[in-house]
A protein has these predicted regions:
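Short basic/aromatic active-site micro-motif
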Residues: 17, 76-77, 164-184
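C-terminal flanking helix
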Residues: 23-26, 30, 210
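Basic, Lys/Arg- and aromatic-enriched nucleic-acid-binding interface segment
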Residues: 18, 35-91, 95
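Catalytic-site neighborhood detector that most strongly recognizes the C-terminal catalytic loop/helix
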Residues: 116-120, 194-215
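C-terminal catalytic core of tyrosine-transesterase DNA break-rejoin enzymes
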Residues: 82, 86, 93, 173-197, ...
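Single conserved hydrophobic/aromatic residue that forms the stacking wall/gate
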Residues: 2-13, 213, 220-223
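C-terminal catalytic core of Y-nucleophile DNA break-rejoin enzymes
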Residues: 116-156
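A Lys/Arg-rich helix-loop hairpin that forms a DNA/phosphate-binding surface
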Residues: 1, 7, 143, 169
Length: 223
């Protein structure tokens, strides 16, 4: 089961981190002549497989969008998450971008052209109808929230949506990536939209269920 697999991968990463920390301490001890040789010398440890990317299915995203939320604060958090799920924009880039003044228009679509905060890599996003609806709702000035508060309040959004698992900021971005790839958007174009420095990073999103909310040509024709 996915849960068992995720738990197994988690154990692998815990072991990797444990040995990584140990090696650091050992090398420091050797530097001060407190230890004569490295006990790890000659040892090889499995790096394990990439963790499975967590994303929402079409049905799950619809539950988030349609959830009846009686708190304005939590409603704003839900809107931010849905906006990210339809754009793939990273949290730091979302917080930085001035949607009121920096959006560009190409044909009948609005687009984001910017450089990522994390890597300074250029990215390009075509804003689809659900994302535009949210922007117009807030008059192109999206709510501001810290990353920590965002993740905390997403747990409440998950409760409203009836999920037995948490939502996270990164899950929105992963949802966008899988929805694009499963609707035929070219890998290199998804990579451009996400601002990945290497297309291999994008390939990690390739295992996902079919999505019905996005037509590939809506983005491909602009790239």
């Amino acid at each position: 089961r996915d849960t068992d697999r995720s738990r197994g991968l988690g154990d692998v990463y815990k072991r990797q981190n444990y040995h990584k920390r140990n090696k650091r301490y050992i090398h420091e001890a050797m530097r001060f002549d407190l230890l004569k040789e490295d006990p790890y010398k000659g040892e090889r440890f499995s790096r394990g497989k990439h963790a499975i990317r967590k994303y929402l299915t079409a049905e799950e995203l619809k539950k988030v969008k349609d959830a009846q939320i009686d708190s304005e604060t939590i409603c704003r958090v839900r809107d931010l998450f849905v906006f990210q799920a339809y754009t793939g924009i990273a949290y730091a880039d979302l917080a930085k971008f001035d949607f009121k003044h920096e959006l560009q228009k190409r044909g009948d679509k609005y687009v984001i052209l910017d450089a990522r905060v994390k890597t300074d890599e250029n990215y390009f996003i075509v804003l689809l109808s659900p994302a535009m609806e949210i922007l117009r709702k807030y008059d192109f000035v999206l709510p501001k929230i810290t990353n920590q508060q965002y993740n905390l309040r997403l747990k409440i959004v998950a409760d409203y949506a009836g999920f037995d698992r948490n939502l996270t900021v990164h899950m929105a971005r992963h949802t966008f990536a899988t929805m694009c790839l499963n609707n035929g958007v070219k890998m290199e174009n998804v990579s451009k939209m996400l601002g990945h420095t290497n297309v291999r990073t994008t390939q990690q999103y390739a295992k996902a269920v079919s999505y019905t909310h996005l037509r590939a040509h809506e983005t491909d024709q602009y790239l």
